């Protein structure tokens, strides 16, 4: 029912068209029929969606843990009630972090920057808000032995897209990381884990965490 595509960097844009073509999905969103999947984009490049907006039904702005299940519940409800594709997109458009390109008329300046975005559907918002997870202790990788220690970065380097996209910096508590690490080692069969973030060395309790892991993994 859905095709979800993570837009990690602009060089993958041609792969999007190839993916849709090989899947026998109509390339342009406006031409898709009722029986075709909803094509949804997310990830860093979704913050500048217009170059590929014609190929997507929905862009998810922000972190998937916040509204993804809500979106799926709306889809199930619409399908159960015999609703149309457009009716589901209208329901999705009311979620603050969902951008439905078909519901906006976009005009451009001569240099191809956006001049104006005007909603053309009453369910579309005047603006789309990025959603983030506020309580980072509630976020975890359910399957991989990968511990995300923090999201965001304190460095704020001007050249770094990820540093801007994943603002603000949010750390997991030391006790939560200890629990995740020991649980993953006991339940996955893996003998090692990875600490993941944009800049793990900046985690404020890194020494205590490393000392704990050294003892735990002996």
Spans of model-derived segments:
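Glycine-rich beta-alpha loop elements in corrinoid/cobalamin-binding modules
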Residues: 2-118
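Generic preference for well-ordered secondary structure
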Residues: 3, 36-40, 55, 82, ...
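N-terminal [4Fe-4S]-dependent radical SAM core
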Residues: 101, 105-146
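Membrane-targeting and insertion segments and their boundary/processing signals
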Residues: 38-46, 127, 151, 183, ...
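Generic detector of short, locally flexible boundary/turn motifs and exposed helical patches
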Residues: 5-7, 24-28, 34, 122-127, ...
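Short, exposed beta-strand "edge-strand" segments with a Pro/Gly-rich flavor and a Y/T-containing core
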Residues: 81-82, 127-128, 169-172
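Radical SAM [4Fe-4S] cluster-binding motif and immediate context
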Residues: 132-218
